[in-house]
Structure formats: C-alpha cells, structure tokens
Amino acid sequence: MSLSLPLNKGFKDMLAEANADIETISVHAALKLLEEPGVLFVDVREAHEFAAGMIPGSLHAPRGYLEFLADPECSMHRDELAAASKIILFCATGGRSTLAAKTLMDMGYSEVYNLVGGLAAWRAARGPLAAA
C-alpha cells in the first residue's frame, strides 16, 4: 500500500483538533492535586521512558494501549481509570497526551486534562518524581 501525499490530515492538524476539544492543566495546578483523592495521573509514555522515572502514583498506560486499558469491555481494562473522578494525562512534552485526552473524551470519559508541557515541564517545576 502506498501513501499519496499530501496527507488528508497531518499530526499538526490532529493536535490542533484535539486541543480545541480538550481541557489542559498547568503543572502548578496539577501539583496541588497530586495527593487529592479521586485524581489519577496517567503516564502515556513508552515503557523505556516510564522506567526512567514517573510522577508518584501515576498509572502507566502507554499511548498504544490506552483504548484497551480504558474500555471496561476489554480484558486489559484498568479499573483505576473508571474509578477516577479526574484524570490528568501526561507524556514527555504534551503531544501524545493531547491525543490521549481527546481519545478518552471520545470514549465518554469526563474530567480529563492534559498536563501542559508534559513531564519536561513537571521536571522544570521541580515536581516530585518516583522510580518506576
């Protein structure tokens, strides 16, 4: 199968569409929610990135598995997602988590937020980190 260029929609278009539909949260605001009951931080980075450190208490849900982990009908479903009253998604810099937030909203989740700047911004703000 060959790809005819130009693409109908590139990654910049997809990010722009997702950003128009999702809510974001600053690192400063997210830090205040870190130990709040019902708030779940979800790390959508790949396993090798996650192994290098994470936000304490976060759920690892790699972007490629998110739909399966979020769907209660799937055997891979993670109960933590359904139980959370607020979900804060993050990746390295915010791109993948933007698309992940849009995906969860499309699936019917509410109170979903993308961490602006991702883990890079979290580190810059000296947010706490834990070993995976």
PLM segments and residue spans:
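Rhodanese-like catalytic fold shared by cysteine-dependent sulfurtransferases
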Residues: 1-39, 47-88, 95-132
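Active-site flanking residues adjacent to catalytic metal/cofactor-binding acidic residues
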Residues: 42
